[in-house]
Amino acid sequence: AYKLVLNQWLLSLFNVKRFEDLAEHLRNEALEGLDENNVHHFHHALTAQLFNLTQLPTELLLEYDQNIVRYTQRLNERRITRGEEPIVWKYFQYLTLLFTEIYLERYFSDPKTLLAGLNAQVAICNTDKLEPDQIAPFDEQAEAWPQLNKLAFWMATGSGKTLLMHANILQYQQYLEKYGRRRELNRILLLTPNEGLSQQHLREFETAAISAELFNKDGRGLFAGQAVEILDIHKLKDEMGDKTIAIDAFEGNNLVLVDEGHRGASGGEEGAWMRFRNALCEKGFSFEYSATFGQAVKGKP
């Protein structure tokens, strides 16, 4: 149910109620790519339809668009040098990145107000629900950011979630930098359900020219804290072993990326990996990506 709350809150900033109300203006494939000023056509299409947004003035949406252009150029540098196909975002990928910009800006600048906004949305969602079905609000007395430091993306297989993950890393680094917190980040960790997927991610990071390495428990590599460290979730345990790593070996301020994390967990392990994920990003942040755990939201990108 929380997924609906965040989704509905984001849509409310655009003065719409359904994702479709935004998407319908952007579906035309002719809108993919940039204009002569390096602004996404999507940006123009959105602001032409949705002007006078009090929460999202056009100049702010343009700032977010230019951030997205910058991340995309960074991810395309090596692709273009090698003569490979550059990334051109589809409308739903662009909206995902735009939503992430909006969320991260508010998370870093004013988490208390972000939490209050989400709670207002919870109250709206609860108006027509019986008590057992109501969503529990966030705790406004407790510190806000630890309640807000996890974002989950439900995306169909083949919808480019790896490309979005790469952009999300750059987005998170941009907002750490903007708010003077870059030095606080300990590690960037990518948790995968198996060794095969770890190797695949390593190759894809190489294509994007993002420093990455398979996690080595016997010593942090040369680029510790700079490189993404890729780790099979089954190697995380409570105790250190020959082939496993104790969860408390990691300090808490990490950016944690979880690819299909629950898919690698049998029933009994499910609670364990969630506990590990929470411990790893306790003082940091996590992005989670899955095609499967959002089947309740059928047919939505």
Question: What label would you give each PLM region?
Answer:
Residues A1-E85:
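Extended, charged/polar low-complexity intrinsically disordered regions
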Residues T47-W154:
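Conserved pre-motif I regulatory segment
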Residues F99-E105, T162-R182:
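Walker A/P-loop NTP-binding motif
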Residues P146-L148, Y179-N186, A224, A249-E251, ...:
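Short helix-terminating capping/connector loops at secondary-structure junctions
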Residues T157:
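The conserved Walker
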Residues L163-A167, Y179-T207:
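Conserved Walker A/P-loop ATP-binding site and its immediately adjacent core
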Residues M165-L176, H234-P301:
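Signature of the SF2 helicase/ATPase Hel1-core->accessory helical subdomain module
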Residues E206-G241:
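Inter-Walker segment of RecA-like/P-loop motor cores
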